[in-house]
């Protein structure tokens, strides 16, 4: 029975990931499945961003400069200006609505920069999957709004009130300064998507009493 249930859940997630309608393809999903779907989508998005970051680093950043660039360009990200938790203790102290609100803020802060990257670098080998990254951003954003409505008795409020956006990526990849700026932005993007993934895992774990809620 457990094996059959697990297979069904995996099939559901695969269908959702492939469906162009995203979360709306399954409007009657249980809350548990909505969280499962959101977590897997966040994991997938985080991995895609991490792969893009890795490919960019290998292509444009000399090995002897990589650690220095990480420290000088990605130590500070705009997301650090919002009161989103940065460690597991603070994360567990936040309500689910707060964590969803922070997640929405992080997702929405990248919408415009990634949309521009998609237009400018769509044919670039390193940024070849950036169109899918943008689609995943929008889809997960939609899914988090659905979760908020489920948790807040159907109310639709402006939870993305902590509005900010990142700088545009530099289109001049021949410029060392431009390459370094993009490297720092990708580092922040990866860091922010890891936060979103972690917040969703914590919410799912504590709501459905999974064995280990430390991430």
Swiss-Prot record:
GO CC annotations, alphabetized: extracellular space
Compartment(s) where it occurs, according to its Swiss-Prot or TrEMBL record: Secreted
* Record-linked Pfam families: Hormone_1
Q: Name one GO biological process term.
A: positive regulation of growth
Signal sequence annotation: 1-25
**Keyword annotations from UniProtKB, A to Z:** Disulfide bond, Hormone, Metal-binding, Secreted, Signal, Zinc
One of the record's GO molecular function terms: hormone activity
Q: Which residues bind Zn(2+)?
A: 44, 197
Q: Which domain of life is it from?
A: Eukaryota
Family in the record? Belongs to the somatotropin/prolactin family.
What's this protein's name?
A: Somatotropin
Give the species. Aquarana catesbeiana (American bullfrog)
The gene name reads GH
């Amino acid at each position: 029975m457990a094996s059959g249930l697990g297979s069904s859940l995996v099939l559901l997630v695969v269908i959702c990931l492939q469906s162009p309608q995203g979360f709306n393809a399954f409007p009657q999903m249980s809350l548990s499945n909505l969280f499962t779907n959101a977590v897997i989508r966040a994991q997938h998005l985080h991995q895609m961003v991490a792969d893009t970051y890795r490919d960019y680093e290998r292509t444009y950043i000399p090995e002897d400069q990589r650690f220095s660039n990480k420290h000088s360009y990605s130590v500070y990200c705009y997301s650090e200006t919002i009161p989103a938790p940065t460690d597991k203790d603070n994360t567990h102290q936040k309500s689910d609505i707060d964590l969803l609100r922070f997640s929405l803020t992080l997702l929405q802060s990248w919408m415009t920069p990634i949309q521009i990257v998609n237009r400018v670098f769509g044919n670039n080998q390193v940024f070849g999957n950036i169109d899918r990254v943008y689609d995943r951003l929008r889809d997960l954003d939609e899914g988090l709004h659905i979760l908020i409505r489920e948790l807040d008795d159907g109310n639709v409020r402006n939870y993305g009130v902590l509005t900010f956006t990142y700088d545009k990526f530099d289109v001049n990849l021949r410029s060392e300064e431009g390459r370094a700026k993009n490297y720092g932005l990708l580092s922040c993007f990866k860091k922010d998507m890891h936060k979103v993934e972690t917040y969703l895992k914590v919410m799912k774990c504590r709501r459905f009493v999974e064995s280990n809620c430390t991430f």
